[in-house]
Amino acid sequence: STGCFDYRGDGEGQGIHAAVEWLGTQNWSNGHVAIYGKSYEGATAWEAAAQGSEYLKTIVPISGTTALGPLLYKNGSAEARSQVMHSNYGGSILDYDGDDLDNMCGDVLEGFLAGPMRYGLGELDPYMDKYYDERSHIDKALGTYNGSIYWVQGMQDWNVDPHQVFGGPPGTHWYQAYIDAGYEVGGMLGQWAVSYTHLRAHETLGN
């Protein structure tokens, strides 16, 4: 980690990568590391995949965000939450005391600007294209990651919507792109929202 909260940026990815490397090289480890999580935690799996560790063997993103830009802005329109989402996460580092100034590094300040600028300027914002490209982990992982993927995604999820799995830049379908690239891809997809799934084995038979 860079010590500066950069909200899904390269610094955050480096911190996750360091954890994967540590786990994969311990004497008690077989060298096979997996990451799973839901929503933002699911994004950490893609951040690790984009770093390309030899020890990361599989990821299980559960309604995990794959690319921050399309989460907040797609089809020529910005979501209302894009104005405040970065600020909400940035505010989580504040204790509202004199030490807060120590946390106001460049990445944090950039994050506070990112949402309102994308909301107000949309595709007319070339600087923020760089910001969001850095946070498109699914694009960076393709061809870099050497493990398998097991996607868990609810089709009724309005928080991390299915576009994060089946979308992509114009002409791109991420789910199919990984299959076409030779990755081992599986998934559990169904009619639920952003939540951990609780399905007993017999409930999936025949599906």
PLM features: what roles do these ranges have?
Residues 151-153:
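Short beta-strand/loop motif that positions the catalytic acidic residue
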Residues 38-47:
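Glycine-rich nucleophile elbow surrounding the catalytic serine of serine-hydrolase chemistry
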Residues 47-144:
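Accessory cap/linker subdomain of secreted extracellular hydrolases
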Residues 179-195:
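Catalytic histidine neighborhood in serine/cysteine hydrolases
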Residues 197-204:
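Conserved small/polar residues in nucleotide/adenosyl-binding loops
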Residues 159-171:
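Conserved alpha/beta-hydrolase "acid-adjacent" motif
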Residues 28-39:
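Alpha/beta-hydrolase fold nucleophile elbow
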Residues 1-18, 22-24:
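Cap/lid segment of the alpha/beta-hydrolase catalytic domain
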